[in-house]
Structures are given as C-alpha cells and as structure tokens.
C-alpha cells in the first residue's frame, strides 16, 4: 500500500543509541533538579521528560533515584578535582600553591551555584550519600593529600 499525500508519515527520530551522551544528558539535568529541589523534591519523571528518555532508562543506567543522586555528586566532585589537578600545585612554592588552591576553590564555588546547592543539600543529609561513594572518598582523599603535601613542604 502506497502512502498518499494525505496519509501521515512518521517523522524520523532524532534519537540515537548513544548511552554515553544519554547518561551525560541525564546527569546534567539531574544536577539542576537535585541542586534546586534536593533529593526528596527531585522527580525522576521530570528528569526523564527533560532528557527525552524514559524513567525506565534512568533506572537502567543508575539503579535508583539515590543511585542517580550519588552519580550526580560523583560527577560534580570529579569535575572540581579534575580542574584542581591541573593547577600543578606540586610544581609551585608552597605559599603560592596554597594561594592558587584557595583562589581556585573560591572561584569554582562562586561560579558553580549548583555545586554549592548540592553540597548544602548533602549537608542536610549529614553526608549520608557522600559517605556511600568510594569514588568521592577517593577524590576527596586526593584533596586532603594535596593540603597535607603543602603543609609538609612548609605552609
């Protein structure tokens, strides 16, 4: 049977099977959702609608709402620590390294309201989800090692 000019045709979908892109998009939208509404107020169905994916796919990728929340925290801390690592603090004199670290931290927090909101929300939870993440513990451990190194070198 041929389509006539009046027969509706299905539009080609712009969706592609790109799990990494989909997960990155989910994390981006979920970051805003959790930052602005907290864990309790965020809704998976709103995240799904904003990312043109299904709740089922979100649960497939992240396991649960809490799993998505932990992934958001891991991504947020990971971005910060990655930039921090590029400061090459070990190559600088201790006082200058500390100055650069403090300035970076201030500038990062000043320019990343969602990060501050996530930290505040997690503080309300008494660090419950930060404590569950081995990745965040490792990331924050490296930050503590950096400060310890600066102290040992003479700050």
Model-derived regions, located:
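Short, structured helix-loop boundary elements
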Residues: 16, 23-24, 44, 66, ...
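Short secondary-structure transition hinges
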Residues: 100, 106-149
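Solvent-exposed, non-membrane alpha-helical residues enriched in polar/charged side chains
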Residues: 23-24, 31, 59, 70, ...
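Residues in soluble alpha-helical coiled-coils and helical-bundle/repeat scaffolds
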Residues: 63-67, 71, 78, 89-92, ...
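N-terminal intrinsically disordered/low-complexity leader segments
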Residues: 1-21, 32
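Amphipathic alpha-helical linker/stalk segments
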Residues: 72-101, 134, 143, 147
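Helix-turn-helix
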Residues: 2, 25, 29, 33-67, ...
